[in-house]
């Protein structure tokens, strides 16, 4: 009984602080818009806020593997909206989102303020994105994150990765670093991190706020060179994500002709803190 009451009080307190953090997010977003990207990096604002949100939610990030430095295309398996907080807090990258989000109330305002790139679903939808993204990368701007599976999963497997967005790395000559996220069950043994199926955002946020805390592993995979066809690059990046998660490699699709190993991509790297 006492534990239930204390748990309810903790959830209520977290909810109030989370609402305050949301108000702070809009304040930061407005500041970024007023200052402009040359005075304040939008990705810095998202990272600053995400680190505080993770602390409030009781989410601890454990990092494993060599973290490369410099501009990169970061690709990652997709489990939850929490992924965005984890990656923004760890890397301060730009993100790619579906074009509908641009016009969503509140969320669209935040996404636009932190320099999100947008992609339209369907045939030819990636062309406008690539037109904007490739020169941006060639100009030496920051890294960006792609979730090439195209949807969220329960985290137990990795879906085939769509190769079309890998064209940005190939065209700009930017290396690809695979990332792998694994959420551990909470202290009550529940897998609450996956945001899948008919789940609603409000209900999921409620479960996360009520949880005693989560641990997420962020694994940095081996850097992949852009000097290979995008289909091959996508398959190799997916294979590296699967390796980081302890999963067997998926057989190469018929469109992928894997010959000799790809040439190594070796910019400076630093060990990720555990």
Residue spans of the language-model regions?
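Residue-level preference for the first positions of well-ordered beta-strands
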Residues: 71-73, 141-147, 175, 217
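A cross-family acyltransferase "interaction/gating" segment
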Residues: 106-108, 156-235, 247-259
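A membrane-cytosol interface segment of integral membrane proteins
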Residues: 116-143
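Cytosolic-facing loops and C-terminal tails of multi-pass membrane proteins
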Residues: 236-274
